[in-house]
Amino acid sequence: MATATLSIDLDAIAANWRALDRASNRRVATGAVVKADGYGLDAGRVARTLAQAGARQFFVAVAEEGVTLRKALGPGPAINVFSGHMEGDTQAIAGARLTPMINSAEQLARHFEALPRHPFGIQLDTGMNRLGMEADEWAAVAEFALGQGPKLVMSHLACADEPGHAANAAQLAEFHRLTDGITVPRSLSATGGILLGEAYHFDMTRPGIGLYGGAPFGAAEPVVRLSIPVVQVRAVTAGESVGYGCSWVAQSDGAIATLSAGYADGLIRAMSNRAMLYAGDVACPLAGRVSMDLLTVDVSHLDEVPEALDLLCPAQGVDRLAEAAGTIGYEILTSLGPRYARHYAGGVA
């Protein structure tokens, strides 16, 4: 079979959620972020597994994701929408019983004109300048909004993966300034914020990348393995080049394995001539450019070339691969393409 295999350990995702739940203050509810189709790993399977583990609050990016997730989860858990109540979202929010995180006075007006008794939350901007009401806007609508009984007031940290960054303390102070004294549950932290300590936990945490084995949660169990089949092995002599642009040249006689995956499968070209693949725990350098459907790998040092080499495995997680590609683990995970044969272990189907 020429199709690469992406193996996903749902039990590891559940174990990572439990670990982050334990890391949160014991009085804190621990939600789960499953946007972007569960970081590319199937939001329905991930969410059902986490619901069985105890998660009751789920977060998605847009209402359309929430509709799909509701079909997978059923009526029980809450599904919160980070983008809030956008124009055209009313039917989806009502039909799938979604909870929009209101980001502006405009969204607040839209929500209460269309769905005056429907649950909602509030998102505040405490310094990231991305989503949420800024302080002046919040001051103008806070009395009305709080009087309608929001389910949650939240913000998001810009630099939580850098524990010593001054922005963390500044955003924490601003969140306190904007919300101290309210009786509504509050949430500031995703994975990185959980690891910053109890001062950042408030009433609910929202782990995302840590569930899927990514930094900054260094204790995470590995979740994915990507095994790519070897199509062909050829001998090369010193001075011969490999791949488009002749960007890799053999320094000595050796062997090149051609593997069946490429940038059409989400393996970004920036990892060309930089990334490693693995035969067990033996590293094999990517030789030449990533092409649409193929990789070429230097296997000169292997006594025997296996039927497949691993790009993601215990020896190389998403963050190590991301470092080679000059990106972040989030991009590696969410780019994994549809051509892979996906095998799920554990969890809930």
UniProtKB/Swiss-Prot annotation:
The active site is at K35 (proton acceptor), Y244 (proton acceptor). Its cofactor is pyridoxal 5'-phosphate. Pathway: Amino-acid biosynthesis; D-alanine biosynthesis; D-alanine from L-alanine: step 1/1. Keywords: Isomerase, Pyridoxal phosphate. Substrate binds at R130, M292. One of its GO terms (biological process) is D-alanine biosynthetic process. Coiled coil: none annotated. GO terms for cellular component: cytosol. GO terms for molecular function: alanine racemase activity; pyridoxal phosphate binding. Its EC number is 5.1.1.1. Catalyzes the interconversion of L-alanine and D-alanine. May also act on other amino acids. Belongs to the alanine racemase family. This is Alanine racemase. The lineage of its organism: Bacteria, Pseudomonadati, Pseudomonadota, Alphaproteobacteria, Rhodobacterales.
